[in-house]
Amino acid sequence: MTPPAIPAAPPATGPAAATDPLDALRARLDAADAALLDAVRTRLDICLRIGEYKRLHQVPMMQPHRIAQVHANAARYAADHGIDPAFLRTLYDTIITETCRLEDEWIASGGAPVPTPVHASASARGAVS
C-alpha cells in the first residue's frame, strides 16, 4: 500500500511551523479512528439484532459458512486495496470472536440485557427488540 503524497512542510520559522502538517495529519487520523470506532459499535449492535433473531428462531449461534464469507470479503478487499490480508484476517478474527461472545451471551440470557457497554447502549437506544 503506497501512502499518498504528503504536502511539503512550510518554511521553518520555529517549532510550531514544523508540526503543523503533522498536526493536520494526526487530526485526520483521529477523525478516521472515530469513524472506525463508530463502525465497530454499529457492527456490534447489528450482531445483537442477529443474536435476537437466532434466539427467537432457534438458529445456532455459530455459523462457520458466514465466518468464511466475511473472511473472503476481507481478503478480496485487501487484494483490491493493497492491504496485507493477514492483517485483515487477524482484525476480523478479533471482531468475530467478540461478536460471537456477544451473540452467545444474548442468546443464553434469553434476550435480557447483560452487563456490557454495548448491550447497555443497544438497550437504551432500543436497537435490540
Curated annotation (Swiss-Prot):
Pathway the protein contributes to: Antibiotic biosynthesis
EC number, UniProt record: 5.4.99.67
GO terms, biological process: antibiotic biosynthetic process; chorismate metabolic process; salicylic acid biosynthetic process
Keyword Ribonucleoprotein: no
Record-linked PROSITE patterns: CHORISMATE_MUT_2
Domain of life per record: Bacteria
Stretches of the chain forming a coiled coil according to its record: none
Described purpose of this protein according to its UniProt entry: Involved in pristinamycin I biosynthesis. Probably catalyzes the conversion of 4-amino-4-deoxychorismate to 4-amino-4-deoxyprephenate.
Name of the protein in question: 4-amino-4-deoxychorismate mutase
